[in-house]
Amino acid sequence: MLGIRAMLVMLDYYWIQLITNNDTRSNNTDTIFVSLLTGANGVTRTAIGGLHSNYTNLTEAFRFTPANTTTNSSTEGNWSVTNLTESCINRGESYLTTIWLLNCADNNTYWYSGNAYNHTIDTCKNTVSGYLFFGMCQLWKDWVTNASHDTVRIQSLGNEIRCMLLPRQYTLNATVEWYNKSEGDVPEEFMDYVILTPLAVLTCGLQEAYILDKGRRYMYLFSVSCAGITGTVSIILVSLSLLILICYYRCGRLLICPRGFELLPEFTEEEEEKEKLLTYKDIEVQVPIRTRRLLVPWIRESKMWVLPPPLPPRPPHLIEFPPSPPPSPGPMHMVVCMPA
């Protein structure tokens, strides 16, 4: 298993390098999206990626809500979800998502969609404004100018996993479908992350979370099926072994008991002494006593041991051979008489 996992990690790294080298680096670093994904057992995943700036009709088509920033103060820290108010983050038994759209060059307005964060309370609005414009914007700018921008960065920050996507501009339609919808076809722009990495966290998206859950569920069912098959085969083998042992000890070295079989009594001491006194001639005349341990009554009394009746004598006319044909005459000499 460790070897297979190491091979998958190497394939993942090679595939990320391949798709990155085939794409051009985005020059626009101002318009970004930030996603928040929460789930059961305290699962929290965030993602930052580039976005095309020419999106329109956010309210009707994509159901985004505009919001104004309420603070301009910067907050020091590592800029994780710990900078947000914990009571503002909604958690449940199923996955909850929120997507924020913002232009880092214009820190007056941002758009949000989803139910993973509560935007109805003023305190929540204040913390999310600083989190987005002073935290996520700075992280994205540092990431784009970083020398290792051609790979996906996965950061583990306590109970949070943050995914820094490749510095490309994703369309809003693909972003909403990947981060805010649990079902549907994988968008073509995010297909590169799924082809060879179906069981790895690379984008922190909602569809990726469901793909991971399905993969783990299938692996669990496969392991349970293997355990069930192994247990069933083990039970069958143990049952056959017990049956063979019972037949061996019950039937006296015979694995298949004949019908009406009964064990003969064991030898007594007197019979043992008599057996020792037998001579070679006695053994020729009678059946040795020791063979009683192997022979069974049904063999002696079976009809297969009775000789068939002798055939009647052959009639005399069948015994006599027919007379041989007479020998063929010898060659004749021809005499020719000539007149004088």
From Swiss-Prot:
Membrane-topology annotation of the record:
Single-pass type I membrane protein
- Recite the UniProt keywords alphabetically: Glycoprotein, Host endoplasmic reticulum, Host membrane, Membrane, Signal, Transmembrane, Transmembrane helix
Query: Which species is this UniProt entry from?
Result: Human cytomegalovirus (strain AD169)
TM segment ranges = 226-246
Gene designation per UniProt: UL20
Location relative to the cell: Host endoplasmic reticulum membrane
Q: Where does the UniProt entry place glycosylation sites?
A: N27, N54, N57, N68, N72, N78, N83, N107, N118, N146, N173, N180
Pfam families linked to this entry: UL20
Give start-end of the signal peptide: 1-25
Q: Which residues lie on this side of the membrane: Cytoplasmic?
A: 247-340
Q: Under what name is this protein listed?
A: Uncharacterized protein UL20
